Amino acid sequence: MPTPRRRVAAYVIRHRAGPELLVFDHLDIPDAGTQIPAGGIRADEDPHTAVLREVTEETGLDLCPVIGAVGIDHRPHPITGQPRHTHVLHLHAPEDDHDSWIHTVRGTDTDAGLQFACRFVSLPLSGSLADEQDLFLGRLDPDWTTLTRR
């Protein structure tokens, strides 16, 4: 059995009139679906370091404090079946007035140069995110469980 790929995913939450989650859509790959910041953990990184890097690379946001670990998703990749362990972490969004923006992915990974349409959406979500990335939202607050999962 192949070694599982180590990954991170970020629930970046802010509180306005109610709780909101940072999500994005690929402008270059519209069929990819709405997602949260996520990606691989490099050999020299721990999940905390990796999630901060991924959030900055994929959204441009930095200074998002990590609140804590939410859980580890052991499901394989939905298309390739490759085993993976995704560490889901809860982060607090920086104080900012931006509700939505376009970001060009930075870094050296395969998504470098892609454009993401980032935005905050109200919780609970009405439907699932790509790859069921919303699976653990209810662990942060049962009221944040995606409506289609109730």
Where are these regions (language model features)?
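Nudix hydrolase/Nudix homology domain
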Residues: 30-34, 99-150
